[in-house]
Amino acid sequence: SEMCIRDRLLMAGMFVIATSLWYAVDYVYAVVVNQQKSLGFDWEHVYYVQAAVLPNESVECDTASRSDDEVTAEYLEFYNRLQHHPAVESACYTLMHFHYIWKNGSGTMSYDTLKTSAMYREVTPSYFTVFRVRGADECSPEELSRRASHTNDFVVTENTACRLLNPDINNMTVKGVELAGRFIHSGVSMRKDEPDSVRVAAVCENQKYNEYSNWSKAVYRIVQLGQGDFKISYGSIPYHDIFIRVKADADRPGFVESFRKEMKKQLRVGNLYLADMRPMSYYRNEHLADYRSDLYTYLAIAGFFLANAFLAILGTFWFRTQQRREELAVRLVAGATPHNLQTLLMGEGFLLITIAYIPALVVAYNLGISDLVETWPVEWSFTRFLIGGLVTFLLLWAIAAISIWFPARQAMSIQPAEALHGE
């Protein structure tokens, strides 16, 4: 019959709409889930301090040759003067590690027969207090810094530790903190005094590279400035970074200008000087600009899908209900109540959407297992599929209910004589 043909066309349209809407909902779900994951560090009140070497053309430059030991001594003096400023809460040194800047080493870590790749970074113990990094067992940054106080010790992120303890990433019974105190093979040797087998002093919380990325696997090699094989030359200065955490009550507008003015002479050590100083918020905003642009674009596309789904379903069910005005009025004349008719129409709509949604779910699941959906930073899982499917179905049903309720309510007001005339 004509009604059957219309219903089949309606279900075909619902299938296309449901699949497209699920894809949009799945992306939004992944974004929301990732935003719930902790960043793993605190960038507020943290500043990057850039030490640089006076150019040879400068009248203040001492052109006498310097050994690496002498340059290292200058660098240590620069660092010590910096951290003793009254406004500085703590300072740290890093090599191959700069939050929001793609500056990393990498290596393969192994424990027994298990291996995993991870970002390799070198930091002083105070790094964990400057960036407020907590332990995987939720210990304070100060306690984590105390545990990681020996040169060549390693601190690994929890996800790295879990990979080294168990190859099954879905096994939640294995805790990363169990790796603390054990020895692993780092696979990376940046300094002469670094042994191949290193002790894991502590396990820290998982860390993201930025707010829009997934947790990264990373290992931190502990260095103590001035100890062991730690050496710096003028040529290597750009690769070494210093960060300070400023006391909250001192971190006010104009702080950088006043700090640089006050410390200009104090931080002139040998041929080293304070070249630049910027808050981490500067690097964060610069780094996240492209991510935000992409996110807003994808969210706009998702919103476009949702708006189109709403209009398509609204128009379809509205037209379908309007086409049955006479039938509904006749049912009223025959003794049906408005509530009965509302229930009938809602039931029909629910059934049509459900029948159309089943094949749409099959297609959606196959899109997921075929990696045709975004799997970074949130991995594909059956739970993700179920939640996305449920949210999509509820959206479809809510839109359909609105689309049915308004025209059905109008149809209830038709006069019996008009209904019988139309019949």
PLM regions with names:
Residues 114-220:
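Hydrophobic secondary-structure segments that place a key small or acidic residue at a functional site
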Residues 34-41, 362-390, 414:
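Short juxtamembrane loops and helix-capping segments at transmembrane helix boundaries
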Residues 25-116, 121:
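Membrane-proximal extracellular/periplasmic loop immediately following the first transmembrane helix
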